[in-house]
Amino acid sequence: MKKVELLIALLITIMSLFTFNIVYASAPNVAVLMAGARQSTKDKNELNELKSKQQLIVNAMQGSMIPEEKTAQVANDYILDNKIDISFSTTDLINIGKLLNADYIVYSQFYIDKINAPGLFHTTMKFKGQTVLTIIDVHSREYKYKISEDVNNGKLEDVSRSMFIVYDKSIADIKLKGLKF
């Protein structure tokens, strides 16, 4: 009986030498900031649809989204504490990401080059500019992805549409190109 117990103990010891530890990678924490989304659309349903794109891009990144409310609060506090008046720099975005304990930060904004004010022959404002979406690795401080969409002499709806376009293209790029985050 003791020989059997010793043999079993020996087998268990030998088997334990050949087992592999499996390391499970956790999903990266992703913060998403969409600057000017409320200004670029008047339709609440469109705004909600645009916000749903945030979760889709995080899903494409195989990440875990930091709640929008928490991200917005940290960004607002950062703006007030650091007296940011125009837009975030890369350093600002990285600092916000660190405050949120994020691995990546996704940032989109429409950058205005020119505004044509309403006048005698047209009654709506027209915009020229670029909607840019960037994904920044907070730890390495590097851009991992960047895409833009031009708006030339477009209305407010065109600015909103450009936001949808950059999100849709980004989601497709991440999935099709197999970008790793």
PLM ranges: what are they?
Residues S40-K42, K114-L120:
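Extracytoplasmic/secreted cell-surface and envelope-processing proteins
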Residues M1-K3:
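N-terminal secretory signal peptides that target proteins for export/translocation
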Residues I8-T19:
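Bacterial N-terminal signal peptides
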Residues A27-M34, S40-I105, E142-Y145, D173-K177:
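N-terminal segment of the mature soluble domain
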Residues N82-K83, F121-T123:
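Short low-complexity, flexible loop/linker segments enriched in glycine and/or proline
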Residues A25-A31, K51-L56, I96-L100, I115, ...:
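C-terminal/domain-edge helix-coil "capping" segments
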Residues T19-A25:
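Sec/Tat signal peptide C-region and signal peptidase I cleavage site
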